[in-house]
Amino acid sequence: MSASRLERRIREAQAAGRPALIPFLTAGFPTKERFWDELEALDAAGADIIEVGVPFSDPVADGPVVAAASQRALESGVTLRWIMDGLAARKGRLRAGLVLMGYLNPFMQYGFERFVSDAADAGVAGCIIPDLPLDEDADLRALLAARDMDLIALVGPNTGEGRMREYAAVASGYVYVVSVMGTTGVRDGLPVEVADTLARARQCFSIPVALGFGISRPAQLEGLSHPPDAVIFGSALLRHLDAGGDAASFMKAWAER
């Protein structure tokens, strides 16, 4: 099977001798108007892939920063339809691969077939749905694959090798390695088990390995003898924007590492 659009973006970064950069930005944050400016700024500043968060009222896996951003977006009227329309209006203008990340409920309410069709028309390259079990994702995965889109797998410290290999049999794009059990959020350092989780993922998956949850600055990767193929950062970026910063200045620290 040939590499998907998302896998190719990460492989291109690897060929340049660096990990791919994958910022996460909640749709409609910090405001509906400014979101689109910051999305385009992330793209211009060198993001390889951008994960666009779909707001949901019960974000059980999100820490306080992402949960607050989601709530603000919902209060301002952000919907999956609004996200689709905005991305479609910018199709062809963004260099980065686009991934929609959110909980199952908004996608189910939208309708899987309609979602996949509209996402493809908007230039989306994949999606991440943390609460969609592997045993129940075959229909959506097939719909996405037919339009050259990936359903990204998530694994963590408690994911056994057997389960990883089950994911690996159907996974595409990249695998999202969760650095720590619990919710998203900024942390001072990475837990010692991260190296082991990354090593197990590399043994099981042939696609790139991306590390997320608790990543806030490049220095956190320095202690890893085998760094991930891609790094995902969200809470630190959202906090930076909420404090009045801009996406370009945040990305600069990562692009120049």
From Swiss-Prot:
GO cellular component, one term: cytosol
Disulfide bonds: none
Pathway where it operates: Amino-acid biosynthesis; L-tryptophan biosynthesis; L-tryptophan from chorismate: step 5/5
EC assignment: 4.2.1.20
SUPFAM superfamilies per record: Ribulose-phoshate binding barrel (SSF51366)
Annotated keywords: Amino-acid biosynthesis, Aromatic amino acid biosynthesis, Lyase, Tryptophan biosynthesis
Subunit annotation: Tetramer of two alpha and two beta chains.
Protein name as catalogued: Tryptophan synthase alpha chain
The gene coding this protein: trpA
